[in-house]
A protein has these predicted regions:
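Bacterial Sec-dependent N-terminal signal peptides
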Residues: 2-4, 14-48, 156-172
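Transition segment at domain starts
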Residues: 40, 44-65
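Surface-exposed or flexible loop/turn and strand-edge residues in extracellular/cell-surface modules
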Residues: 42, 46, 68-70, 100, ...
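A short hydrophobic beta-strand element
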Residues: 45, 86, 113-115, 143-150
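Hydrophobic lipid-interacting interfaces of membrane-associated proteins
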Residues: 50-54, 89-94, 119, 154-156
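Predominantly extracellular/secreted and cell-surface proteins with exposed
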Residues: 63-135, 139
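Edge beta-strand at a domain terminus
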Residues: 98-111, 144-172
């Protein structure tokens, strides 16, 4: 009887020994049945801004000990475009306000890439009327981001100046 009871318990416990061993590890949850989930770079960022006018660092021109200024900005990522909003006070210049919507972008599981070239957007940056030619950059899933804004001030005049803004930042 004891032997039969042992066999019965073994027979009942046998299904517990067979476990489904599928590949159910999500990793970083970016691939779902072959569908890649893009990162979400929307949010607020803190970083440093460098402004170059005709290739010279604007901050160093004003003060040789300063090469950049702290800056905060917001990225709003949509399906194929991204909006950039800077509204912050920066060293020497004071208030920097820039709102650009509809910057072409692509996203994958690793990063958001801004690839706005040949934009021709007229804005006022740091007191100069400029034409923004391009906004490019990348924001990674770790929250690190880099932006490059290329513009021309006083375009079409003998005093035309090239304005380049470089920002490196981290998501808050």
């Amino acid at each position: 009887m004891k032997k039969n009871l042992l066999y019965l318990l073994m027979f009942l416990a046998m299904p517990l020994a067979f476990v489904a061993c599928g590949d159910d590890e999500d990793g970083d949850n970016n691939n779902n049945n072959g569908i890649t989930t893009p990162i979400n770079a929307t949010g607020e960022y803190d970083g440093d801004i460098e402004i170059f006018i005709n290739g010279e660092n604007f901050f160093q021109t004003a003060n040789p000990d300063i090469t950049s200024s702290p800056v905060s900005f917001t990225i709003n990522q949509q399906a194929n475009t991204t909006s950039l909003s800077i509204n912050d006070s920066i060293l020497i210049l004071g208030e920097l306000v820039l709102q650009v919507d509809g910057v072409p972008s692509t996203a994958d599981s690793e990063k958001l890439t801004l690839n706005g070239t040949d934009m021709g957007i007229e804005k006022n940056i740091i007191g100069l009327d400029v034409v923004i030619n391009s906004i490019t950059g990348a924001f990674t899933k770790t929250g690190a981001g880099n932006l490059s804004i290329e513009a021309a001030a006083l375009k079409g005049t003998p005093l035309e100046q090239e304005v380049n803004i470089e920002i490196s930042a981290q998501k808050k």
